[in-house]
């Protein structure tokens, strides 16, 4: 049978049965083999429409909605083994990869979808989102513009574009875009929520609360909005709010995403009300549900610390004197999340010579690329691969980091801050490729810090934080990693204890600026008056003078923190400030 005969047969088949996803997909494959990509795209588009009635794909889709990723994945992989060009299934597998934070895998899958079916608009939207989450703003905006050419008034596209603009610090443009969309189409709860996020970032708390409330009025069960209100830290829920959240949890059709967000929000509401037992129960449920949705190997941190300690010795660094890019611009603030890094950033960003940015993903992405791991089951070549890098390669990597982060710099200040906390995993890389960069370790009492993590739902990353024992193990690994670098590179890392800052703000600020080689400026003590945008969970706390309340909030919950204390072990014993 000739290719033309095959196409004629398949066209006759789909004419008889237009709901056959397999028939349309086979026709798309046939047109692809003939090189007629326009006809293939049209056939794949019909396959996508027909697939919405496919029982197998519906089962996978329902599992994704319910957050049952372990159920969805084998269905989709079996499907693609039989039909490798099923673009609907490939797109769903990409969604699964994205949910797991495997954005590189998701990107490859979506690129394949768009190669087969360039007119698959939902896949292109997913592609833009994945590019955005990998900090590739220019590429994401290019995909959004392709979609917007046909749908200029699509609120979902405008919402994503505004989020991308906000990610690169173009906050006013993002706010203007949100406002224009909502003026035309006010019944958009997700856009109101995103607008609230942007308003919070620039310090317009009252407007953010109003935007979040507009979203709730449109969709009362939208868990992320309730959590966003709770996450403002300075909003107190009333009895009606608590009843509304409890009522939403009773809905049978509530999504897994809405459900765990509501548990976190109710945990905060009941904590503020002083009902600590009920509060902890909700925090525990929210964390357990979120933990079931993420992949995390608690042994990875200990393995990484052991491998790093074996590699990064005094002899290793002595043999590489003069390696790397000598630019002194970056200031890395790292450590555990919720340890005071945003406070340190706000203090330093109030200095005339320092620009604050955000938690930049560029260094971990460079490390991941060096590791070369394609599958989670594979071993990473990182950090040992660093021993093979030449002086020129180290300099090139330092220059790459500076180029990648340039889009975040909006002023002519000579220094800028990267406050990705997890960069403590990459101190060896920093010292190798950016030897003149400064490194600051933000510390807070392990129980206060870890329980603050447990109460916090992170939009992405920090998968270690959803189980008390795993959280303690991660914190222990962090302290061991820092102790190693203190031993092999004394003085390379400046440590700032949150408790010391509370006790003596000016003294700690002067010591910090001295480490950075910067003159003292009074503005650093009045950091809370800064109008700069702040994107992290501590955004509202750093807009007020320093407070002591956060030091002992964990004590209300200490009867439930046994697994955390046991896992922390020596990290708890060795902390220099008493509880």
Residue ranges of predicted features:
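Alpha-helical solenoid repeat scaffolds of the TPR/TPR-like class and their adjacent stem/linker regions
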Residues: 1-410, 579
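PAPS-dependent sulfotransferase catalytic domain
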Residues: 168, 202, 211, 216, ...
